[in-house]
Amino acid sequence: MGQSPSTTAAPTPDLNRHQIPQLHPNTDSDFTDYTLRLSDDCLAAIFDFLSTADRKRCSLVCRRWLRVDGQRRHRLSLNALPELLDFVPSLLIRFDSVTKLALRCDRKCASINDDAMVLISLRCRNLTRLKLRGCRDITELGMAGVGDNCKALKKLSCASCMFGAKGIAAVLDRCVTLEDLTLKRLRGVHHITDVEVGAAASLKSICLKELVNGQSFAPLVIGSKKLRTLKIIGCTGDWDETLVRVGCFNNGLVEVYLEKLQVTDVGLVAVSKCFGLDTLHVVKTAECSDVGLCAVAERCRFLRKVHIDGWRTNRIGDDGLLAIAKHCLNLQELVLIGVYPTFSSLAAIASNCRNLERLALCGIGTVGDAEIECIADKCVALRKLCIKGCPVSNAGIGALASGCPNLVKVKVKKCKRITGKGVEWVREQRVSLAFNYDDSEVEALDGSASDGVGGAQDNTVEFLPTINQTTVAVAEADAEASSSNNNNRLTMLRSRFGFLAGRNLVPGAFRRWSNGDNVSSSSSFG
């Protein structure tokens, strides 16, 4: 019928699209790399905004980008398998400015040995931070090499390693600038005598976590005269004597964290000698009572952060909180878990602690509508509030619609008497308020048990500033298996409850097992 063969229509040009001929890849003669106008520092600053995967891809664009990326990377996270030894020379030639290094290995795999550790320390002489996790084939010889070659080391963290006290002593004797030491689940800890020399003169922070013989490091804790932060978490043995000696010889502590320990009021009274104390965490210490807390409150009047998990032993209550309300007028952060305060103590804190900005009430059967209404009326500076597992109803939450003028965030979880309608009404009244509401069923008691990875900090409320950091990972570290076999679980239970053996607890120490308001103690404002 006179029809011509069909042909592909020419594409309609996009008149709104502006092309720059100089950047078009087909115009080779006119091609200009505009990144050449950027200095290396500027290019490196751009790389800092990229994710780890994107930064890896960018390093393959050209030789200059590869060089800039290698010279400006200060953090490396490596999978510490034995095969890493073959790649260490070339890897650390490329990344010759590394100051922060993490070596991680799965607990079921063999790790790098002393030869690899010494070689790494020779190539990274400017290291300021070193983290070893699961490196079970490194002995005290490898750690001695770290001490000999990394004289600028300031922060050392070791978890699930086998070199024990000898390996730590080898580093401490050689790195006189070490300021921060963290030891978690360290094997081979028996006795140590010379740890207090050398690094004790510069150590400012010590963290001992889940050590079977953690008291082997008591001389180090006592001998560190510049110590500012002390964290002892889940370590076996009686710690009263160590704290008494710390209070006598090292009263400059600013932060003290005591968690899942065999410590009594004797230890708290010793801590009270640190008059400049700023932060105190007393978490699941079954034998601490109002007596020790009152002593700390009366002497440490600069306290700003207090976390108390009474483990529902009913030994910390109104008396201790009234002492805090009376003496700690600068209090900014208060977390109460598993204790039984009444209206009088909470009202005193709300009235006297005018700078209180963060408050968490978790698993407290004595906190109801009246207490929340009092907080809403008197806590003028309050910015963040967490209520979890408390008998509070819509009436109590409704008071937040007009109270606490500076309140920006509220978290409500596992409060059976609070309904979605009550929460929506508060949201309508205060549109700018971030309201996090969870009406899920109440969990079993202590649902946040440590699995050896998350650790004891899962049971506390942490208020941490948001920090944007690009963590560099050249070789992706395998995720450590979170599940453990029956033997590991039995060992963990023994380490947790073994300190209760032979101790005279009050009759109500285990009343929490029969309470109907069981609630997990984990909470967060995140």
Task: Describe every region a protein language model picked out.
Residues 2-20, 25-28, 192-209, 215-223, ...:
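C-terminal capping region of solenoid repeat domains
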